[in-house]
Regions:
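Histidine-centered, metal-coordinating catalytic motifs and their short helical/loop contexts
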Residues: 89-115
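Sparse recognition of residues in long alpha-helices and their boundaries
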Residues: 77, 115-117
Length: 173
């Protein structure tokens, strides 16, 4: 929920989102340590495990986006063009949304052998950033990071905050 007064915004749901992402970051940190100590991290399933927690994080952020859009009665397509831009040239919000959709749907796409029409934009955004199918979300998260640390909180929350501020200055539509 967004509370607005005198040009200040307090996103009370953001605190809960941050708390969840911190839990997921703790899991990612444990996985990174395990990777360093593993002779076969891929065979040990550590990369898949990391990808899972990253996907959960992106979906939680997507839910936060949707809650904000509903609260402000703003068009989703327009809203995902707002806020900071990713190095790929697409808005960070659009990349986060695509990452969440990727995590939810990529298994069925590959099982069916094709990406449906409504998934083509997601596929394009993620492949433009990752350049590979395996561990695509890890690559997307890394593309947001200024360091080698994979942190949903440090890498993504600033973009969520900027996006929320941009929602408040754009006309509703």
């Amino acid at each position: 929920m967004l509370l607005v007064n005198e040009n200040k915004v307090h996103d009370i749901e953001l605190d809960r989102l941050r708390e969840l992402l911190e839990v997921l970051d703790g899991k990612l940190y444990q996985i990174e340590k395990s990777i360093l100590n593993s002779a076969e991290p891929e065979s040990d399933g550590l990369f898949d495990r990391g990808e899972y927690f990253i996907g959960v994080g992106f979906v939680a952020i997507q839910q936060h986006f949707i809650d904000s859009l509903i609260a402000l009665d703003i068009n989703k397509k327009e809203a995902y063009s707002l806020g900071s831009k990713h190095s790929s040239g697409v808005s960070c919000a659009a990349v986060i949304n695509a990452a969440a959709n990727w995590w939810k749907h990529e298994a069925e796409w590959f099982k069916n052998g094709s990406v449906p029409k409504n998934g083509e934009r997601t596929f394009e955004i993620i492949m433009n950033i990752s350049n590979q199918y395996e561990y695509a979300l890890s690559n997307v998260l890394a593309s947001f990071s200024e360091s080698k640390d994979l942190s949903l909180t440090k890498s993504i929350i600033p973009h969520v905050e900027e996006w929320t501020k941009a929602l408040l200055v754009e006309p509703k539509g």
